[in-house]
């Protein structure tokens, strides 16, 4: 099972509830960094937050009481197949490092209209694998006013 298909959130439940509460009050930051050792559940946590945000106002929405994604939810199916139009996933799974061209995709992605008036989300897995040019490009994007 991959982080994008993990139905149950097994760790960071209190942190998740804090972010949900911020979202409910429209105070969720527009940039979040999850840092920690490999294998502790950061990606799973991120995908749960993404599924929560995308599944609001949809049938079979995120189950906050049990910290579970409903596998019948439309957004979950799109996210788990990496086909959600409001999600850009950048990862280094097929390469040694993340190249600057992948980071520049963020600019193209963010310039497009949002699908269903939902938030657009960029998830960079293994951000430590960016080369120096990619790091500089990301820094420039993050420094831009949003």
Q: Where would I find each of the regions flagged by the language model?
A:
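P-loop/Walker A NTP-binding region and its immediately flanking N-terminal helices
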Residues: 1-124
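Conserved catalytic/switch belt of AAA+ P-loop NTPases
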Residues: 111, 136-146
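Conserved binding/catalytic microenvironments
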Residues: 127
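Conserved D-loop-proximal element of ABC-family nucleotide-binding domains
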Residues: 131-133
């Amino acid at each position: 099972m991959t982080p994008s298909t993990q139905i149950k959130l097994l760790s960071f439940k209190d942190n998740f509830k804090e972010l949900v509460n911020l979202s409910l009050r429209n105070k969720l930051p527009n940039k979040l960094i999850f840092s920690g050792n490999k294998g502790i559940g950061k990606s799973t946590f991120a995908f749960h937050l993404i599924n929560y945000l995308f599944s609001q106002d949809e049938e079979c929405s995120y189950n906050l009481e049990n910290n579970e994604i409903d596998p019948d939810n439309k957004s979950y199916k799109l996210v788990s197949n990496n086909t959600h139009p409001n999600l850009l996933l950048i990862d280094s799974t097929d390469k040694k490092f993340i190249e600057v061209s992948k980071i520049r995709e963020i600019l193209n992605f963010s310039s497009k209209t949002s699908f269903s008036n939902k938030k657009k989300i960029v998830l960079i897995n293994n951000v430590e694998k960016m080369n120096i040019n990619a790091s500089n490009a990301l820094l420039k994007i993050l420094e831009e006013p949003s």
